[in-house]
C-alpha cells in the first residue's frame, strides 16, 4: 500500500487566511520601511563607522600591549633563546663599532657566542671592539673587515663572506643627520642616507644569505627604526630607508624557510647619533636595549626591542597620523633644538671634546653644520 503523501505545508502550518493577511500586512509596511526605517538604517550605519574604527584601534592597541607584557616581563621567567646552536659558527656584524651594533655584539658574546666577523669602515674602532671582546672572553675568535657601506661596490665583501660558515647576522649599519630638513634641501646628505641605510644595508643581506643558506640556515637580526613605521616630515630619506628594511626583512623571512629574520624597530636609544649619553624615561641605554632584544629572539619576528619602546609604540596603534603628529613632531623639534645648542652654544671645553668624539665618524661635510655619522641607532 502506497504511503499517504503529507498534506500541503500551508494547510498544516499556516492557514490560508492567515497567510494572505500576513503578506498583505508585509506589503503595506514596505513603503514605510523604505522611507523611515531606511533612513534610520543609513544613520545607524554612519554612526557605526567611527565606532568600528575606534574599536579596531583599541583592539590592536590592547593586543600589542599584551604581547609586549608577555615578551618582556613574563617570557624571560621561563624562556631563553637557543643561541648554543650558533656557538661554533660565525656571527657577522655590520655597524658593530658603535651604539646598538656594538652593544648587541657584546651581549651575544656574554651569552656564549665566540666567533665574530666585525665589518666597518673605521679600522681603529674595529680593533677597539675586537680588543674589548677578547679582554672579556679569552676564547673568542674575532675577525675584522674594513668596508664602506656607502661605496656601492660589494664584490670584495661578497667574496670575503662566501667562504664563511655564517650562522648569525646582525645588520645594524646606518647613518643619520642632525637637522630636520625637507627632502632635497640637502641632497648630499639625502643621497648618503639612501646609499648607506637603504642600498648598503639591503645589499649586505644579499651577501650573507647564500652562504648562510648553504650552511643550513640561521638567524638574522636587522636594526630598522620606529621612524620607518609612519612617514615623518623632515625625515623623508631616513624614514624611507627604514621602511624599506622593515618590508625587505619580512619578505626575506618568508622566502627562506631555514633562515629566521627578526626586525628591530626601536625608538630613541642613548647613542652618538641621538646625542644622549645616558638613559631616561623614554630613552634607553644600548646595553639595556640589547639585553631585552636578544631575549626576544624566537618569540617575535618584529619588535621595538624592549618594553619601554613597545609601550611607546602603542601610540602608533592607537592614534591616526592626524592626532599622532601633534605628539611626535614636538619631540623631533626639541631634539633639533637640543643638538643645535650642543653644537653652537657650549663653552664647556669638556663638552666640546665630547662633541668632537661624537662627530669623528663624519661622512659628508656640509655648510649647514649638520653631521652625518655612522652608528647603530633608531
Swiss-Prot record:
Substrate binds at residue 225. CDD domains: 17beta-HSD1_like_SDR_c (cd05356). SUPFAM superfamilies: NAD(P)-binding Rossmann-fold domains. It is a multi-pass membrane protein. Its EC number is 1.-.-.-. InterPro entries: NAD(P)-bd_dom_sf, SDR_fam, VLCFA-Steroid_DH. The chain crosses the membrane at residues 35-55, 61-81. GO terms for molecular function: oxidoreductase activity. It comes from the Eukaryota. The keyword Lipid biosynthesis does not apply. Pfam families: adh_short. One of its GO terms (cellular component) is membrane. Keywords: Membrane, Oxidoreductase, Transmembrane, Transmembrane helix. It is found in: Membrane. Belongs to the short-chain dehydrogenases/reductases (SDR) family. This is Uncharacterized oxidoreductase dhs-5. The gene is dhs-5.
Amino acid at each position: 500500500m502506497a504511503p499517504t503523501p503529507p498534506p500541503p505545508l500551508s494547510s498544516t502550518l499556516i492557514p490560508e487566511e492567515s497567510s494572505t493577511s500576513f503578506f498583505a500586512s508585509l506589503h503595506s509596511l514596505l513603503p514605510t520601511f523604505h522611507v523611515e526605517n531606511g533612513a534610520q538604517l543609513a544613520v545607524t550605519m554612519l554612526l557605526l563607522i567611527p565606532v568600528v574604527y575606534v574599536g579596531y584601534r583599541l583592539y590592536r592597541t590592547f593586543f600589542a600591549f599584551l604581547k609586549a607584557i608577555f615578551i618582556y616581563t613574563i617570557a624571560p621567567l621561563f624562556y631563553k633563546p637557543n643561541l648554543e646552536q650558533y656557538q661554533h659558527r660565525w656571527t657577522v656584524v655590520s655597524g658593530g663599532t658603535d651604539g646598538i651594533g656594538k652593544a648587541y655584539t657584546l651581549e651575544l658574546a656574554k651569552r656564549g657566542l665566540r666567533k665574530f666577523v666585525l665589518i666597518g669602515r673605521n679600522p681603529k674602532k674595529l680593533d677597539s671592539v675586537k680588543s674589548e671582546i677578547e679582554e672579556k672572553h679569552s676564547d673568542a675568535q674575532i675577525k675584522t673587515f674594513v668596508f664602506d657601506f656607502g661605496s656601492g661596490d660589494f664584490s670584495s665583501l661578497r667574496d670575503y663572506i662566501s667562504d664563511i660558515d655564517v650562522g648569525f647576522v646582525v645588520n645594524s649599519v646606518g647613518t643619520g643627520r642632525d637637522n630636520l630638513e625637507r627632502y632635497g634641501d640637502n641632497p648630499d646628505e639625502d643621497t648618503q642616507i639612501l646609499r648607506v641605510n637603504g642600498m648598503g644595508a639591503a645589499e649586505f643581506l644579499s651577501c650573507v644569505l647564500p652562504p648562510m643558506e648553504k650552511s643550513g640556515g640561521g638567524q638574522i637580526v636587522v636594526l630598522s627604526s620606529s621612524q620607518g613605521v609612519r612617514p615623518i616630515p623632515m625625515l623623508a630619506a631616513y624614514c624611507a630607508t627604514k621602511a624599506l628594511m622593515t618590508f625587505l626583512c619580512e619578505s626575506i623571512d618568508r622566502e627562506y624557510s631555514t633562515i629566521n629574520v627578526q626586525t628591530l624597530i626601536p625608538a630613541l636609544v642613548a647613542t652618538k647619533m641621538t646625542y644622549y649619553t645616558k638613559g631616561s624615561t623614554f630613552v634607553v641605554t644600548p646595553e639595556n636595549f640589547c639585553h631585552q632584544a636578544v631575549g626576544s629572539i624566537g618569540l617575535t619576528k618584529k619588535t621595538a626591542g624592549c618594553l619601554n619602546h613597545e609601550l611607546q609604540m602603542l601610540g602608533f596603534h592607537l592614534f591616526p597620523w592626524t592626532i599622532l603628529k601633534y605628539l611626535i613632531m614636538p619631540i623631533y623639534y626639541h631634539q633639533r633644538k637640543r643638538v643645535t645648542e650642543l653644537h653652537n652654544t657650549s663653552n664647556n671645553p669638556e663638552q666640546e671634546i665630547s662633541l668632537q668624539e661624537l662627530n669623528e665618524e663624519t661622512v659628508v661635510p656640509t655648510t649647514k653644520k649638520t653631521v652625518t655619522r655612522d652608528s647603530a641607532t633608531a
